[in-house]
């Protein structure tokens, strides 16, 4: 974890006016705070929505479009306008910034995931602020992050950030809808976001029932599971981000329950990879994987399901339960051939081949099913 590396997510509601257009004063206020954080030697990554809001007027829409083609066309115009505005504002502080547009498929393909992460780290090393947005123009409904909340969580995990700050127009997470219940109490800190808390946001007028909060809770849960603590709330003034990182923010702090962050290879395996098959193992291999810190060898494999190749990701089961998933070092054909040869010759001296290296193995408790 880099103690001075912070991801800040700014949503459309924190950038727009009552007409749904970009509010340049709001954007300028955010840049002022981001610049101050940068000047205090923090590495700053900005995840910003707002492309549609910046562009829809230029297409002749009187209000924010609701059709997919309208949104994507607006984003195509608006993203350029948005990034140009950000760059001009940052240059007032002699701070360079750069644009990265990402989609879910950039995370699902391992090489692209590594390249995106390497690019972000190189920009930070050079003192540049990466400005990240989902590539709305080409994204499809089935493969989106959802208002950039989840994107910010995944970015914070991949670059091993010290904190994720999700800025919103709500001053934190409440036990009830603060607009409907005068007795609503804000959580100053949350140790663990439960699925019950997330589901409650679907119930009108119930616990945490603030619009847009569900996606923020889901994102915070994923970030915390990756070892990144999260702040959800708002702030005022040029020092608002410094106040947040120093523990004095106007909102809710979500603690991470992990003492150390997860390597990016394991993040990709657990959160982004596509499953290509299943491997069933015996009790000895289970002991090696789950308790002894070992790798999975072919000698411990009982059976396989599906056709997979070297580098694919598979689920691993023992005789009773799902144990986890891993990136294989051999194909299903090679694995089955090795075990068939061993059985045919009834020999134990045939060298076992490595199926999953320990560094490419993720136990089931690290796999976030709510994100799949």
From Swiss-Prot:
Its pathway is:
Amino-acid biosynthesis; L-proline biosynthesis; L-glutamate 5-semialdehyde from L-glutamate: step 1/2
- Top-level taxon of the source organism: Bacteria
Q: Where is the PUA domain?
A: 276-360
Flavoprotein as a keyword? no
**Pfam families tied to this protein:** AA_kinase (PF00696), PUA (PF01472)
Key word Cell membrane present: no
Q: Which family does it belong to?
A: Belongs to the glutamate 5-kinase family.
Annotated protein name in UniProt: Glutamate 5-kinase
Q: What is the scientific name of the source organism?
A: Oceanobacillus iheyensis (strain DSM 14371 / CIP 107618 / JCM 11309 / KCTC 3954 / HTE831)
Q: Top-down, what is the taxonomic lineage of the species of origin?
A: Bacteria, Bacillati, Bacillota, Bacilli, Bacillales
